[in-house]
Structure formats: C-alpha cells, structure tokens
Amino acid sequence: MGSGIETMVEKLVVPTVKVACGFKVEDNELIALVGFAMAPTSREVLTKVSFWLFKINGSVLKCGICDRGPLTRKGLFLHLTRVHREEVKALVRDELTRELKKVAHAGKADLL
C-alpha cells in the first residue's frame, strides 16, 4: 500500500480503539486527523473495526482479540493500544482499503 494510506492507518488506531471502548470521538477530532474529505469514510472504518475489538459477556468487558478480561473501559483501551496495536492497524488497513475501493468504484459508475 502507499505511504499515504499507512499514515492514515496509524492516525486511525487510537480513535478506533476509543470507539471500541465506548469513548466518544468527535467529528472535529477526526477531521483534524484525516481531513474533511476523508472524515466520513474514516468514521465508517472506525465503526466497523471497533465492533471486532471487544466482547461483552453480561456486564464483563473483554478483549475481542485475545479474550482477556474482565477489563474496565480504560483498561481495555490501554490493553488494545499497547498489546494489540499491530493487529488493530491491520484491521484498520484492510477495512480502509475496502472502503476506498467502494468509493473508487462508485466514482467510476458516476462517470459512465
């Protein structure tokens, strides 16, 4: 992948983990990270990837990657950013690539 996508992936790791832990990511924060044009696509990526990063069993919060828990929201945030950063980056990279391909195909269809 291009270095532009890698830069964006790195910037989206922390917001993705924040969403997974139930913390808010404001639109202004996202716009500051990736720019106005990429903010909606980035929001879609955050939402989709964050779903896979946690599990709730009753009232117990666990890591969705290694099943470690019980964890608090802050504990899950620290665990995901420190232990599973590379896995989160890979998930974000895959989903971002998928979303960008959808946008590219939609743009080509509009031109026809």
Positions of predicted regions on the chain:
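Intrinsically disordered, low-complexity linkers and flanking regions associated
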Residues: 1-51, 96-99, 106-108
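C-terminal recognition-helix end and immediately following basic linker
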Residues: 43-65, 69-105
